C-alpha cells in the first residue's frame, strides 16, 4: 500500500497532493475529513485530496513520524512541502482544522509556493498557541474598552 501511495504522489504533476493520515473512526479525523470533503471541489484545480489509514501503511508511519491522531501533509511533484504554521512543527498539520477557509488558504499557499520551487511556505495565518493567547487577551481588553464607552454614552444621554 505504501508503494502505491508513493506512485500516486509521483504521477500528480500539476497539483498539490494533500494526504490526511489517521484512522477513519477517530473523531479528529472525521472532523478533518468533513472539512476536506467540503472544500475538495473548490480546490480541485490546485490539489487532490487523499485520506490514508495509517494501519494500512506501517512503513510510512516511521518515515513521516505519523504518531499524532490526524496529521495532514502536503506533497508536490513527489516532494514533501512543509508549512510553517507557527507551531514549531513544519512537517504536517497535527490537528483537525475547524475552518474551511483556513484549509483552502493553506492549500493555496502551498500550491503557489511549491510551483515556485519552495520546499517550505509560511501559513497565511499564525496557528501558534501564543498567538491564540494574545488574541484572547486583546478581546478581553476590547470588551473592557467597550464597556467604558457604553458607560460614557449612557452618562451623556442622562445629562442631556
UniProtKB/Swiss-Prot annotation:
<comment type="function">
    <text>Plays a role in pre-mRNA splicing as component of the U5 snRNP and U4/U6-U5 tri-snRNP complexes that are involved in spliceosome assembly, and as component of the precatalytic spliceosome (spliceosome B complex).</text>
</comment>
<dbReference type="GO" id="GO:0005682">
    <property type="term" value="C:U5 snRNP"/>
</dbReference>
<dbReference type="Pfam" id="PF02966">
    <property type="entry name" value="DIM1"/>
</dbReference>
<dbReference type="InterPro" id="IPR036249">
    <property type="entry name" value="Thioredoxin-like_sf"/>
</dbReference>
<dbReference type="GO" id="GO:0005681">
    <property type="term" value="C:spliceosomal complex"/>
</dbReference>
<keyword id="KW-0507">mRNA processing</keyword>
<keyword id="KW-0539">Nucleus</keyword>
<protein>
    <recommendedName>
        <fullName>Thioredoxin-like protein 4A homolog</fullName>
    </recommendedName>
</protein>
<keyword id="KW-0747">Spliceosome</keyword>
<comment type="similarity">
    <text>Belongs to the DIM1 family.</text>
</comment>
<dbReference type="GO" id="GO:0005634">
    <property type="term" value="C:nucleus"/>
</dbReference>
<dbReference type="GO" id="GO:0046540">
    <property type="term" value="C:U4/U6 x U5 tri-snRNP complex"/>
</dbReference>
<comment type="subunit">
    <text>Component of the precatalytic spliceosome (spliceosome B complex). Component of the U5 snRNP complex. Component of the U4/U6-U5 tri-snRNP complex.</text>
</comment>
<dbReference type="GO" id="GO:0000398">
    <property type="term" value="P:mRNA splicing, via spliceosome"/>
</dbReference>
<feature type="region of interest" description="Disordered">
    <location>
        <begin position="132"/>
        <end position="160"/>
    </location>
</feature>
<dbReference type="InterPro" id="IPR004123">
    <property type="entry name" value="Dim1"/>
</dbReference>
<feature type="compositionally biased region" description="Basic residues">
    <location>
        <begin position="133"/>
        <end position="160"/>
    </location>
</feature>
<keyword id="KW-0508">mRNA splicing</keyword>
Amino acid at each position: 500500500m505504501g508503494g502505491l501511495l508513493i506512485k500516486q504522489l509521483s504521477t500528480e504533476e500539476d497539483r498539490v497532493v494533500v494526504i490526511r493520515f489517521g484512522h477513519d473512526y477517530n473523531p479528529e479525523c472525521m472532523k478533518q475529513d468533513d472539512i476536506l470533503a467540503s472544500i475538495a471541489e473548490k480546490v480541485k484545480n490546485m490539489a487532490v485530496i487523499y485520506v490514508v489509514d495509517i494501519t494500512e501503511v506501517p512503513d510510512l508511519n516511521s518515515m513521516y513520524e505519523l504518531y499524532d491522531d490526524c496529521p495532514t501533509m502536503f506533497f508536490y511533484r513527489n516532494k514533501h512541502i512543509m508549512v510553517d504554521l507557527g507551531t514549531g512543527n513544519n512537517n504536517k498539520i497535527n490537528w483537525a482544522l475547524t475552518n474551511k477557509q483556513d484549509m483552502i488558504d493553506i492549500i493555496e499557499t502551498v500550491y503557489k509556493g511549491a510551483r515556485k520551487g519552495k520546499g517550505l511556505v509560511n501559513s497565511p495565518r499564525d496557528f501558534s498557541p501564543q498567538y491564540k493567547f494574545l488574541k484572547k487577551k486583546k478581546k478581553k481588553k476590547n470588551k473592557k474598552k467597550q464597556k467604558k464607552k457604553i458607560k460614557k454614552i449612557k452618562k451623556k444621554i442622562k445629562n442631556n
